[in-house]
Amino acid sequence: MTNPRETIPPGNSGEETIEEAFDWLDRTVEAINREAVNHLPRELIFQVWQRSWRYWHDEQGMSRSYTKYRYLCLMQKAVFMHFKKGCTCRGEGHGPGGWRSGPPPPPPPGLV
């Protein structure tokens, strides 16, 4: 995953469109998922996605993009805390499925 500080989110120059902002959000969510799956259990990623969707989209009535944004914030915090606690898997990762043995569950819907 590239350094997130190097990525300037859309909207800072005033020339971006809403569609570009949504594309940026989708790319960033996919990138954090690709990194997180190497460090966190797939069940955790799946549950955070499902619960974010259920709460923000279904219960609160927020848009899809807002739900993805809230999910992105949670996953960034989870990956940050994992690294802060001394992750030694920066190069190789924990392998597919994080710490779980056996076949991995399906990835979050729409984020394959």
Swiss-Prot record:
Binds to human NUP153 as annotated region, ranges: 61-80
Stored Pfam families: VPR (PF00522)
One Gene Ontology cellular component annotation held by this UniProt entry: host cell nucleus
Keywords: AIDS, Host nucleus, Host-virus interaction, Inhibition of host innate immune response by virus, Viral immunoevasion, Virion
Protein's cellular compartments: Virion; Host nucleus
GO biological process, one term: symbiont-mediated suppression of host innate immune response
Positions of region (Disordered): 92-112
Xref: Gene3D superfamilies: 1.20.5.4730
Annotated family: Belongs to the lentivirus VPX protein family.
Name listed for the protein in its UniProt record: Protein Vpx
